[in-house]
A protein has these predicted regions:
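Short, contiguous alpha-helical
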Residues: 1-36, 41-87, 128-176
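Acidic/histidine-rich alpha-helical segments that form the ligand environment
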Residues: 88-128, 135-147
């Protein structure tokens, strides 16, 4: 029987970084999709003073990276930045509900390719990146996992900054 413990562990981390539950009572999470669920429509395109990236632009970036990494590591390696297949909307006009569906589909497609790996030996197999290098499959998957977590934090910070109180939740709740 093929050894898949590494693949299964990466798949669990992938899902946790993308849609992990977090703390339900306070809507706090380090997961991308969970954080997006707590973003108001007003905050979707809003910018704090001095900022240049909205939550909308961050989500478009994350989705586009999922599409590109998937195409180069597991597909035909023919997609290009700046094309509708990779970047379906310009910043400032992306319909939030459609972006959410697109992001989920891009994530599911990438996860399905990882889940289809035959065994853990494939995690060491070099695969293409969209900048021309070959990297081990596990590196590509790890990069996408940490990419979700990184931008989830960025979204969380923007949402907090745009809101009425960006103190730590435990301080807001009187514990600090």
């Amino acid at each position: 029987m093929a050894e898949r413990g590494g693949i299964e562990a990466l798949l669990d981390l992938f899902e946790e970084a993308f849609r992990g539950r977090g703390i339900e009572a306070s809507h706090e999470s380090q997961a991308l999709l969970t954080n997006l669920g707590s973003v108001s429509d007003e905050a979707w395109r809003a910018l704090p003073a001095g900022a240049s990236r909205s939550i909308e632009s961050i989500v478009l970036h994350v989705g586009s990276c999922k599409v590109m990494y998937d195409d180069y590591a597991f597909g035909s390696a023919t997609l290009a930045w700046g094309t509708p297949a990779v970047e379906p909307w310009a910043e400032g006009v992306a319909p939030r509900d459609e972006v959410d569906r697109w992001l989920i589909e891009a994530h599911q497609r990438l996860v399905a390719h990882v889940a289809a790996l035959a065994d853990d030996d494939e995690l060491d197999r070099p695969r293409r990146t969209n900048w021309g290098e070959l990297r081990p499959t596990r590196w590509i998957v790890a990069a996408m996992i940490t990419h979700d977590a990184y931008h989830a934090g960025e979204i969380n910070h923007l949402r907090s900054t745009l809101g009425p109180d960006d103190r730590w939740r435990y301080v807001q709740d009187g514990f600090g």
